[in-house]
């Protein structure tokens, strides 16, 4: 545990004491070494958890998410270099400090044993994210996006705190390791239903559930590149992880209470996919596609079967890497043509052929082409939801079709077609960008060879 936390804390002096010319190379290489040390966490000889201390542990569910969090920091630092180029050194260093703080909170959130500690760290991730969005975003609307993000998350999370304090007083402990050993079934009453709602709502807002998703497109569109990456790749996964952890306590109630939410997810999944077909703004399209993918994860978790949990974990990891890569690609377009409108960027295949290769790979992963882990996740979710109700196959099949449509629509609109007349002196694709894309793509390709390390605790 400390072999990850202490080097992460040491990134602060590395950032602030590095020479100005060495800031990027030092932080990137240091954070990459931390993420390689974290690979040891993925080794679970048995299906048990590794208990580092009384407060922190990792198990087959949290270790893939931990690995994703650690892998993302060097990528965010690499992606941010261009848009911070004209900022003064102090601001560059404070931006990096925010990213490192966020990384530290996220690592501890995924490792927490106590649910109250998990809640505190879950809320703490809000602060650095908010500062990144409202300070380094592009347009003035970033303040509005920050307000949405803050109030949606806070309003959703307050009932969870009350519910956790109530559970603590009634059960005596909220330790995740012991709680399922002496768990009493919750009584079947309306107050239990309220407790279930209070516990689940915070994670539903974070995921986000269709209907509570309005903060997500705003936050994604206005955030700088690192903000978008960490938001899509890790912060949405906090919701899924929290739901998997807390549904253990709410055992029999979920079966009856999940119906309206399952309906809403299946409906919202198709709605948000359809919205993607009508988008002109590239970042907004990727944000809405995140909502539709996360709806699948909510379905998988609420059906409450081992296969569902496996599918949800696989889909979360796959989506984390894929959507982060899509945001990087959108950002590399934005740095060249200074517009997020897709039609403005058409015909880039002739100018940047290598970037088109990355666009193709990212789009194919997004539409879950075999044998990607996106497909493995989606298949497991489909099997799970089919066991719950046969009709869901039609809805999930329709969603897969629309996902394929908007992924290819995005690819064709940005890469094919005639060049717009004002694109004549573009920068070529940089080695930094190609490295960044390959570092997103390689884990996705390698995981197709051995997906069981990210299939969670039930494999």
Swiss-Prot record:
GO terms (molecular function) for this protein are: NADH dehydrogenase (ubiquinone) activity; ubiquinone binding
Q: List the catalysed reactions.
A: a ubiquinone + NADH + 5 H(+)(in) = a ubiquinol + NAD(+) + 4 H(+)(out)
Q: Biological process GO annotation list?
A: electron transport coupled proton transport; mitochondrial electron transport, NADH to ubiquinone; mitochondrial respiratory chain complex I assembly
User: What cellular component GO annotations does this protein have?
Assistant: mitochondrial inner membrane
Q: What class of enzyme is it?
A: translocase
Give the chief site where it resides.
mitochondrion
Give membrane topology per the record: Multi-pass membrane protein
* Presence of the UniProt keyword Electron transport in the record: yes
Q: Which residues cross the membrane?
A: 22-42, 60-80, 95-111, 113-133, 147-167, 194-214, 224-244, 257-277, 284-303, 308-330, 342-362, 391-411
Query: InterPro entries this protein is in?
Result: NADH4_N (IPR000260), NADH_Q_OxRdtase_chainM/4 (IPR010227), NADH_UbQ_OxRdtase (IPR003918), ND/Mrp_TM (IPR001750)
Enzyme Commission number? 7.1.1.2
Sorted alphabetically, the keyword list is: Electron transport, Membrane, Mitochondrion, Mitochondrion inner membrane, NAD, Respiratory chain, Translocase, Transmembrane, Transmembrane helix, Transport, Ubiquinone
Q: Where in the cell is it found?
A: Mitochondrion inner membrane
Q: What's its job?
A: Core subunit of the mitochondrial membrane respiratory chain NADH dehydrogenase (Complex I) which catalyzes electron transfer from NADH through the respiratory chain, using ubiquinone as an electron acceptor. Essential for the catalytic activity and assembly of complex I.
Record note on quaternary structure: Core subunit of respiratory chain NADH dehydrogenase (Complex I) which is composed of 45 different subunits.
Q: Which family does it belong to?
A: Belongs to the complex I subunit 4 family.
Protein name (database record): NADH-ubiquinone oxidoreductase chain 4
């Amino acid at each position: 545990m400390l072999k990850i936390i202490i080097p992460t804390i040491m990134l602060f002096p590395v950032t602030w004491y590095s020479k100005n010319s060495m800031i990027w190379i030092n932080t990137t290489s240091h954070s990459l070494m931390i993420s390689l040390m974290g690979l040891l966490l993925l080794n679970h000889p048995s299906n048990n958890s590794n208990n580092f201390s009384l407060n922190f542990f990792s198990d087959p569910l949290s270790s893939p998410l931990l690995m994703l969090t650690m892998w993302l920091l060097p990528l965010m630092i690499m992606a941010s270099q261009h848009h911070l180029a004209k900022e003064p050194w102090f601001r560059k260093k404070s931006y990096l400090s925010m990213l490192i703080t966020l990384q530290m909170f996220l690592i501890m959130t995924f490792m927490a044993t106590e649910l109250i500690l998990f809640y505190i760290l879950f809320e703490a991730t809000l602060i650095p994210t908010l500062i990144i969005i409202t300070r380094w975003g592009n347009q003035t609307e970033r303040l509005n996006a920050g307000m949405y993000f803050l109030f949606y998350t806070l309003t959703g999370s307050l009932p969870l705190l009350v519910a956790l304090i109530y559970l603590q007083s009634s059960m005596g402990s909220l330790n995740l390791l012991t709680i399922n050993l002496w768990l009493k079934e919750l009584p079947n009453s309306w107050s239990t239903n309220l407790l279930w709602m209070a516990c689940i709502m915070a994670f539903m807002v974070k995921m986000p559930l269709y209907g509570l998703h309005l903060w997500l497109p705003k936050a994604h569109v206005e955030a700088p590149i690192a903000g978008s990456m960490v938001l899509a790749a890790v912060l949405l996964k906090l919701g899924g992880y929290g739901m998997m952890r807390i549904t253990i306590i709410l055992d029999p109630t979920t079966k009856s209470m999940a119906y309206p939410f399952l309906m809403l997810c299946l409906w919202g999944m198709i709605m948000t996919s359809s919205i993607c077909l009508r988008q002109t703004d590239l970042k907004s399209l990727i944000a809405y596609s995140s909502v539709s993918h996360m709806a699948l994860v909510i379905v998988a978790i609420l059906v409450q079967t081992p296969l569902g949990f496996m599918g949800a974990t696989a889909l979360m990891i796959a989506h984390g890497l894929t959507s982060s890569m899509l945001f990087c690609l959108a950002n590399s377009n934005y740095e060249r043509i200074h517009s997020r409108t897709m039609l403005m960027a058409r015909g880039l295949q002739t100018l940047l052929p290598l970037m088109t290769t990355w666009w193709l790979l990212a789009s194919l992963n997004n539409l879950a082409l075999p044998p990607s882990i996106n497909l493995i996740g989606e298949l497991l979710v489909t099997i799970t939801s089919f066991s719950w109700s046969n009709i869901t196959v039609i809805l999930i099949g329709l969603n897969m079709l629309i996902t394929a449509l908007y992924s290819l629509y995005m690819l064709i609109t940005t890469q094919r077609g005639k060049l717009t007349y004002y694109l004549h002196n573009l920068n070529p694709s940089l080695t930094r960008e190609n490295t960044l894309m390959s570092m997103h793509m390689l884990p996705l390709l390698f995981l197709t060879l051995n997906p069981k390390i990210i299939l969670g605790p039930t494999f």
